[in-house]
Every structure is written in structure tokens, then in C-alpha cells.
Amino acid sequence: MKLQYESLTIRQAEVADAEQLTTWWNDGAVMAHAGFPNGLGTTEEEVIEGLGDGCMVIEESDRLIGECNYRNVADGVAEIGIKICETDCQNRGVGRKVLSMLIGWLFRNGYSKIVLDTNLTNTRAQRVYESLGFRKVRTNIDSWKDQFGRLQSSVDYELVEKDFVSYIDCPKEE
């Protein structure tokens, strides 16, 4: 899968991307929202082993700026995740466009519902998800522990196609 819109590209992650993915995944500033304030402590070899369908990278003007993923969790239901890892690319609407590209592709390819969760403290992400039409399903208070054993809370979201608000025209697919 390869999707393009303006200067943005979403494509399948490749072995050549593993070094950058490893750097991001080991960066506590990038991974803190996911419960890993010290990073994952993973190796490039482990990242390469984990590359597969649904593991994608985000490029802006041919520069790697983040990653996204999806996985089938039930019949017609995909769970997604996204990280804009390069701080100079955050707060510019890139995530909203990338999510519009990915979600539109998932709906065009047979999915009827998209689900995701985010840390309760990640209000920036919550605003983006809600602007795309996601509906808050549940708040899970003190439901998991981060790397330091601190209790964390999360918010579960879901989106059906009729509620989807895209921020792009249809992207080019290859």
C-alpha cells in the first residue's frame, strides 16, 4: 500500500526504515504517551522482525516524519495508531491529513469501523480524533501502568464511515 496526498506519503515500512524507527521507539519523548518514558529499548534487528502488513511510515517531501499502523481486530473492524515523531512536523495539521488518508483507505477497502485509544492526558490527539468524527466510547481510569509503574488512564474511540470527516480530497493510491 502506498498513499500520496500533496507532499505526504504513507507507505509500507521497509528494512531501510528500521534505523529511524528504532531511534524513534527508543526516544522517551516520542514514546512517553504510550507508557514508555524511557523508550522501548529495542534493537534494529527486533524492529526488522516486527515489520509486516499494517506497519507503515509517514513521509513528507521524502523525509521520514512518523509512523502509523493498522490491524484487523474483528470482522470489518480495524484498530489504528499514529505518531508524528518529528517535532517540527507537529501542530501543523499533518496528523489530521495522514489520518484522513489512512481512514479513507480503510473504509474503501472493506472496513466498517475504526477503533483506537489514546492516553487521557493526550488532549491534542483527542481533539484531532474528534474533529475526524471519532466518538468517545469509554474512559478507562487507572487501567494500565507505564514503564515506571505509574497508573495511567486511556480513552477508547470508534468511528463509522457515515461519521467520518475527511480533511483531504481522495489521495493517490499505488
Give residue ranges: language-model regions:
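A short beta-loop-alpha structural element at the N-terminal edge
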Residues: 8-23
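Acetyl-CoA-dependent GNAT
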Residues: 34-89, 99, 105, 160-163, ...
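Active-site acidic-Proline motif in GNAT/NAT acetyltransferases
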Residues: 86-92, 120-121
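Conserved acetyl-CoA-binding loop-helix of GNAT-fold acetyltransferases
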Residues: 91-108, 127-131
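Short glycine/proline-centered loop/turn elements that form peptide/ligand docking sites
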Residues: 95, 99, 121-125, 142-148
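Short hydrophobic/aromatic beta-strand or adjacent loop that forms the aromatic wall/cage
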Residues: 53, 152-156
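Conserved catalytic-core motifs of GNAT/GCN5-like acyltransferases
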Residues: 115-118, 135-153
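Hydrophobic alpha-helical core bundles mediating ligand binding, dimerization, or RNAP-core interactions
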Residues: 21-29, 47
